[in-house]
């Protein structure tokens, strides 16, 4: 327990500097990063596009368990990412950014682990309201994989609609429908297709679906 407390203290001491560095990176380029070119189809499964969970979220000693996992090494990366998510959810974004900076610096975006870090970071940023920064992380995760990951169209559509870039959102949603029309042609299966999304996020995507259905864009 004492070791875990010391580890948390060390992470917290580093939070200020890392947060400042990441904020500067976001201000001077990440937010303006363009999205990859829209493709016709997105059939490729990306095993990295899943929440990184080591300890069940309802555990009473969640933070202590995650700190122990970080120290043991075998699941240190997953534990670091989950701990970052806990920090964001508890209103401690500076600590969350520090932990994600640590996880990002230890992985390459061309690896499954690196893509997973950036995919998860994107979701935590999105839920913090930093949608442009979330898109930058997701774009990096997408670029690290050969092929066209199936998670991309709906995720980008959600983010772009949230930013008010509704025409672009519909274009990305159309790619999801072209790829799997039985899945994305309506919003009826969202709970099954998007189990890790919040109800509010699925509701936003349903707005995109309605806009797509009202005027489906042609390809190309």
Per-segment meaning from a language model:
Residues 15-26:
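Bacterial N-terminal signal peptides
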Residues 109-114, 145-153, 178-192:
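Boundary/linker segments of alpha-helical solenoid repeat arrays
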Residues 29-82:
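N-terminal leader/linker segments that initiate helical-solenoid repeat arrays
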Residues 178-220:
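Terminal, low-structured helical/coil segments at or just beyond the last alpha-helical repeat
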Residues 61-66, 97-103, 131-143, 167-179, ...:
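Alpha-helical repeat scaffolds
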Residues 85-150:
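Alpha-helical adaptor scaffolds
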Residues 65-73, 105-112, 144, 183:
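Flexible helix-coil transition and linker loops at the boundaries of alpha-helical arrays
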């Amino acid at each position: 327990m004492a070791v875990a407390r010391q580890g948390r203290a060390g992470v917290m001491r580093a939070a200020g500097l890392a947060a400042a560095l990441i904020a500067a990176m976001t201000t001077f380029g990440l937010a303006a990063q363009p999205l990859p070119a829209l493709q016709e189809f997105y059939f490729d499964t990306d095993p990295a596009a899943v929440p990184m969970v080591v300890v069940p979220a309802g555990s009473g000693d969640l933070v202590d368990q995650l700190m122990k996992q970080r120290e043991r090494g075998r699941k240190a990366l997953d534990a670091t990412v989950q701990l970052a998510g806990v920090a964001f959810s508890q209103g401690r974004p500076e600590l969350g950014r520090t932990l994600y900076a640590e996880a990002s610096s230890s992985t390459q975006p061309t690896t499954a682990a690196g893509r997973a870090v950036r995919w998860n970071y994107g979701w935590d940023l999105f839920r913090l309201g930093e949608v442009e920064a979330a898109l930058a992380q997701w774009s990096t995760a997408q670029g690290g994989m050969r092929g066209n990951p199936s998670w991309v169209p709906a995720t980008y559509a959600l983010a772009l609609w949230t930013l008010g870039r509704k025409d672009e959102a519909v274009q990305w949603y159309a790619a999801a429908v072209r790829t799997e029309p039985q899945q994305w042609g309506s919003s009826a299966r969202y709970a099954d297709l998007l189990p890790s999304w919040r109800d509010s996020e699925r509701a936003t995507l349903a707005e995109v679906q309605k806009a797509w259905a009202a005027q489906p864009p042609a390809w190309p």
